[in-house]
Amino acid sequence: MIFDEGTAKNYDEWLKTSQGRYIDKREKALILDLIAPRRGEKLLDVGCGTGEHLLLFKDRGCNVTGLEPSVPMLAIARQKLGGNAELYPGRAEELPFPDNEFDIVSLITTLEFTDDPAKAIGEAIRVSRGRVFLGVLNSCSFKAIQRRFGELFRPSLYRKARFSHIYGLTGMVRQFLPDARIQWGSVIFLPAGWYGFAVGLEETIPVMKNPFGAFLG
């Protein structure tokens, strides 16, 4: 599934809302805790979208590369990053890079829209010489139920999304790396609409090895 210009703009507009900013902050905190990027590391973000996570990693001193199949999203990423990232069109299942090219490879809400998630994971492992981060929409979360219910009444890009759970995700990873050391956690536990008044409650919930947050990494 390739996103059009309207989807790209809607995503960036959502990030400007109070709920979008809070959810984005929580997700990025989990991503940084798990990846622990270091200055000078080479990082590839597969399915980089409009470049939000490339900016995050660039600010941590990484040398960033992004790959994205959507031309409109890639155009926005170029506007945001200028010459501070190498950006390529392409698909997660066919990465145009040699083996062991990057210290870190991330796929953040990318597997949901790939034709072959296992192949995409295998490609990420192939081009990484260090860490691979998989960030997904969690099928075992309250928000996943809300999204699926909402699809019955209005069109949604989530209708074609493939949600994941931790056991399916780790199973795919172990097809390629049977002895991999896997660290994981999740965030965003509350229903949509609660984040105007229940931020304190969200932040009391344990994150690491909690399988019920809407964003799982």
What is the role of each PLM region?
Residues 1-38, 52, 130-160:
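Conserved class I S-adenosyl-L-methionine
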Residues 160-185:
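Short alpha-helix
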Residues 118-132:
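A short glycine-rich, Lys/Arg-flanked "PGG" loop and its adjoining helix->strand segment in the class I
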Residues 44, 50-94:
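Class I SAM-dependent methyltransferase SAM/SAH-binding core
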Residues 109-112:
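Short catalytic micro-motifs in class I SAM-dependent methyltransferases
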Residues 181-217:
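A C-terminal cap/extension of S-adenosyl-L-methionine-dependent methyltransferases
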Residues 106:
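A conserved beta-strand element that flanks and buttresses the S-adenosyl-L-methionine
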